[in-house]
């Protein structure tokens, strides 16, 4: 019983530590969400935590919103076969 509990706890921690992270991307344009206030950023945090994104934390890094704790289903920059600003 203790072994099962330990295995479950380890799997949970692995999922938490290895959660997806990356730049939040606009699916229609292929561009990153821009921001100008580097570091802690209310806009980025709000966008990353939105229901359709599912992230746990967001901040402004290199003038774009970086998200942590994203589910695997959330798209991040770059999108395959879609370049920002190009058709």
From Swiss-Prot:
Cross-referenced Gene3D superfamilies: Knottin, scorpion toxin-like
Residue positions, PTM Cysteine amide: 84
Region forming the signal peptide: 1-19
Domain LCN-type CS-alpha/beta: from-to ranges: 20-85
UniProt-recorded Gene Ontology molecular function terms: sodium channel inhibitor activity; toxin activity
Entry keyword Transmembrane: no
Cystine bridges: 31-84, 35-60, 44-65, 48-67
Entries under InterPro entries matching the protein: LCN-type_CS_alpha_beta_dom (IPR044062), Scorpion_toxin-like (IPR003614), Scorpion_toxin-like_sf (IPR036574), Scorpion_toxinL (IPR018218), Scorpion_toxinL/defensin (IPR002061)
Comment on protein domains: Has the structural arrangement of an alpha-helix connected to antiparallel beta-sheets by disulfide bonds (CS-alpha/beta).
Family: Belongs to the long (4 C-C) scorpion toxin superfamily. Sodium channel inhibitor family. Beta subfamily.
Protein name from the UniProt record: Neurotoxin Cex4
UniProt organism field: Centruroides exilicauda
């Amino acid at each position: 019983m203790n072994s099962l509990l330990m295995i479950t706890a380890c799997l949970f921690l692995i999922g938490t530590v290895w959660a997806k992270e990356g730049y939040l991307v606009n699916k229609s344009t292929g561009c990153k969400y821009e921001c100008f206030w580097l570091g802690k950023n209310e806009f980025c945090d709000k966008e990353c935590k939105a229901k359709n994104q599912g992230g746990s934390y967001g901040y402004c890094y290199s003038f774009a919103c970086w998200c942590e704790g994203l589910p695997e289903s959330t798209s991040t920059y770059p999108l395959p076969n879609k370049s920002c600003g190009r058709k």
